[in-house]
Amino acid sequence: MSSLATLLVLSDSRLPTGGHVHSGGVEEAVSSGLVVDLATLRAYLTRRIRTSGLVTASLAAAVHRGSLPAAAGEAGDAETDARTPSPAARAASRAQGRGLVRLARRVWPEQDWDGLGATPHLAVAAGVAGRAGGLAPDHTALSVVYTTMTGSATAAQRLLALDPGDVAAVTFALSPLCEHTAAEAAKELADLSDPLLDVLAQRHLERERPLFAS
């Protein structure tokens, strides 16, 4: 498989990694009246791409390059924890990382996945998977940023009963931002945070019978 095809597959929302049960805070944002239509969804996605998307992608790119060790308990793990203030967001990250590793074991069995531990962060797992798949670090970053956007967009589509074509048009419009963010993420580790996204992640835990895990 070519590196471009691998990039497309890793960015496919149909991958059985468990990502479809996470909304990236959109469910809580919808419940709180922060995301109510296409315009507010676009604003939310833009904010998420520029913050958590950038940070997660920068960690994945660093793991891919080898500048952050991927082994459980090493710098990759610690740096991701340090950049994820919300315990709920950390748990969601590790759940998605576990799902990605479960699939990656089948695709690249020669890779040492055991060294990542039972619940690696998504950024760490994505970095190792991108390297195993022969991607360049910036393409690994792009797959992370893109799925950060599309996961939340699809969740909002379901929660607000939005027209799928309209939501797709929003993601097309934000594609240049995804590319720019991935390029920035591949340069160096990002260390910003977004208190709103952290609050939404924590408040989601208190919601009764949520549709999404996060």
Swiss-Prot record:
GO terms for molecular function: nickel cation binding. It is found in: Cytoplasm. The keyword Cytoplasm applies. One of its GO terms (cellular component) is cytoplasm. Residues 70-95 are annotated as: Disordered. The keyword Transcription does not apply. Coiled coil: none annotated. Residues 83-95 have a biased composition (Low complexity). Required for maturation of urease via the functional incorporation of the urease nickel metallocenter. Belongs to the UreF family. This is Urease accessory protein UreF.
